[in-house]
Amino acid sequence: PRHFLTHNKKRYQYLNKIVPLRKCSDHEFLTFVETDNQFYHYPLHVTDLKKMPDKKKIKKELQKRSLLKIKNSKNMEDFWINSIGKTLYNKTINTYNKKMWLVDSTKKIDTFNWSPKGATLKSGPRAAWDKAISCYPKKINGYNDFFDLPKKKNLKILFKTNFKLISLKNKIFEINKVKKKFDIVISTISPDTYFKNKIYGELKFIGRDFHKIVFPSKEIFPKNVYFLYYANNEKFTRLVEYKKFTKHKSKTTLIGMEIPSNNGKYYPLPVKKEIEKSKKYISKFPKWFYSIGRAGTYRYEVDIDDCIEQALKLKDEINNNSFEGAFPIKKWL
């Protein structure tokens, strides 16, 4: 289960018509910091600072912050140290992001302001998404009604299918070893997939290993807490209690554990070198070939609402026969 997040009312209204949504904007994230033996809010809240054993040192570091230094930061480490100081950075950001992105230094992450949480040190409401629309489908089947729409249009859907590019110039592809010709192709997979020799090098992704744990209790997490993050040396990044989203009634509860790995292509790396590499691949696609979605756009920050926006824009382009290229929205160029 995944909640729907957006700052755009039109995208919310569009999905809400198809899948009635229940608001859950009050939910909070907590991060466990082992050195303090304490849970703090994520993003960090100003009230958390009072609980910290080294709060005096942190206060001095915060007083030395410079807006100019923050603005001119070149990588994730610089950005966060300039924003909250070295002590808070080491408590909550450094180890967490190194294990999340499987890197030995956050200096390697040079697009560093992509966090949807939108704050380095929060004040006001403790809910992580108080300035955005956060919601989840009311029905027990989640988003299924949205994904069932193609059935109503009598579209042909093929599962477990091998899809291979034969010739972009001649619009020829191979499906299960049978050659086919298409007028328009919409791809949501990594753009380097279509190039045999990976001419610019393979695009890097981070995957996830998921472990499910059932507990003999109706709920485990505190009220309004759906996610627990772990900013220490444990292998996993976070735990999720799915019942908080679904409102499922049961005597037991299911917790999901997420461990970063190289299994699967879930998260494009927020690294300029990789993003520029993806643009080179996408520039090879003709105007009738669309590369969209998180993997197709090769942007970690592309969320569900962005995918909907891309799809609706693409629909308009196709209906108006006004193909503009692989990205149907200029901001992702």
Report the location of each language-model feature.
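Mid-domain catalytic core of redox enzymes
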Residues: 164-281
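A short acidic, glycine-rich active-site loop
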Residues: 1-3, 133-137, 212
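Active-site/ligand-binding neighborhood in enzyme catalytic cores
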Residues: 38, 54-172, 178-181
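Conserved flavin/dinucleotide-binding core of flavoenzymes
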Residues: 44, 238-333
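Short loop/edge segments at beta-strand edges and connector loops
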Residues: 25-26, 157-162, 167, 207, ...
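Dinucleotide-binding Rossmann-like beta1-alpha1 core, especially the glycine-rich loop
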Residues: 1-68
